[in-house]
Amino acid sequence: MSQSVSERTRIKSDRYESGVIPYAKMGYWDASYTVQDTDVLALFRITPQPGVDPVEAAAAVAGESSTATWTVVWTDLLTACERYRAKAYRVDPVPNTTDQYFAFIAYECDLFEEGSLANLTASIIGNVFGFKAVAALRLEDMRIPYAYLKTFQGPATGIVVERERLNKYGAPLLGATVKPKLGLSGKNYGRVVYEGLKGGLDFLKDDENINSQPFMRWRERFLYCLEGINRASAATGEVKGSYLNITAATMEEVYKRADYAKQIGSVIVIIDLVMGYTAIQSAAIWARDNDMLLHLHRAGNSTYARQKNHGINFRVICKWMRMSGVDHIHAGTVVGKLEGDPLMIKGFYDVLRLTTLDVNLPYGIFFDMSWASLRKCMPVASGGIHCGQMHQLIHYLGDDVVLQFGGGTIGHPDGIQAGATANRVALEAMVLARNEGADYFNPQVGPQILREAAKKCGPLQTALDLWKDISFNYTSTDTADFAETPTANV
């Protein structure tokens, strides 16, 4: 016997509630949820629109970054909805604010394709940042579970193997970015590489926007750089290198340049963050297959990482890039010309260098996390640093870092080689003093160590006279929520 329309409607209503329902009532908020070891966890800084309850805003973010749309859909009945819904399980007010909240959200691991950063980010940051229920939204931190991490390759080389290849231990590595970064001919570019390496640097590097322009095509640059590397290595007896930028318009062209770099003897190439997550992972797989180091310039990151209330915190980018498989990434200097709160920078470096992360709120680390045996990623400090800051750089950044003095090498009045020598002597003098127990970070002691070293090194004395104690101390935009730091109160 056929059922009446009213009877069918009654049965449907018993099984399924249609229409627009608050996200919190649809299962995207669960204060009693027990976090599972296999969950992907995300911490968002939420600024709800006026009149929007913080819990509802958190649930909305959870819903829109997982399975929800604006209305209930009957096809929910065809899925394991309870399992696949992301669950906001905790909302805390952000210290020292009146309209911001930390929302903790758990995602079932099966929501994400294995080993695909593009798929992970398509959910976590794909749609929710334009959602009307929130006035601003920032992804502050993530916990990637062991099971999901193991589907990513991580850095192919890592810090330990890179040091073995260079035969350099117990101190930062030294580098410089060729300046001016645009306009040099290939021959002059190669000369800069040679002079810097011969003067004592371990690396020179292409900058983010030197690719293949009319004034210097990529093949010309690669050949002259390798000539400079080989001559400097022969003259010094040290392993040297220069990061060759293979960033291009298509992956076909990226691979073409990468293959050529390998063929002529390069050991390291560089790509830019603006290439995109799929391109970065593809380049990392190529680097692993070809036994090459992969350096990542974070070009473009501050368009979404710098503002405190909206975007993506750079510590999350650090996690994603370590998962993707880059060996180096620019991660801040504290004392240079670019954004860099000391506690935030230390948090970035911990994310890249530690095997296990513990909750450290002053550093902005909200989750315990094991790196599941993925290799460590070498942080790079670059942008407005010079040898007179060596005591500060070593104190803040430690040993496992590449210190890149671009202008601080090439801007030396006596030439590029002299600038490189000044940096090398300053580094070795400071490391030696530290190892002997000196209070090198003391503002009276550190500069004096450099002055003593300069008595036997003319290039260092010239550099100290030129740049003195210049630093770029501005109030940081992105500061710790749970501690005050010096640059936040300049």
Curated annotation (Swiss-Prot):
Intracellular or extracellular location(s): Plastid, Chloroplast
GO MF terms held by the record: magnesium ion binding; monooxygenase activity; ribulose-bisphosphate carboxylase activity
Residue numbers binding Mg(2+): K205, D207, E208
Catalytic activity: 2 (2R)-3-phosphoglycerate + 2 H(+) = D-ribulose 1,5-bisphosphate + CO2 + H2O; D-ribulose 1,5-bisphosphate + O2 = 2-phosphoglycolate + (2R)-3-phosphoglycerate + 2 H(+)
Quaternary structure and partners: Heterohexadecamer of 8 large chains and 8 small chains.
NCBIfam families: PRK04208.1
Listed name of the protein: Ribulose bisphosphate carboxylase large chain
The organism's taxonomic lineage, starting at the top: Eukaryota, Sar, Stramenopiles, Ochrophyta, Bacillariophyta
Gene: rbcL
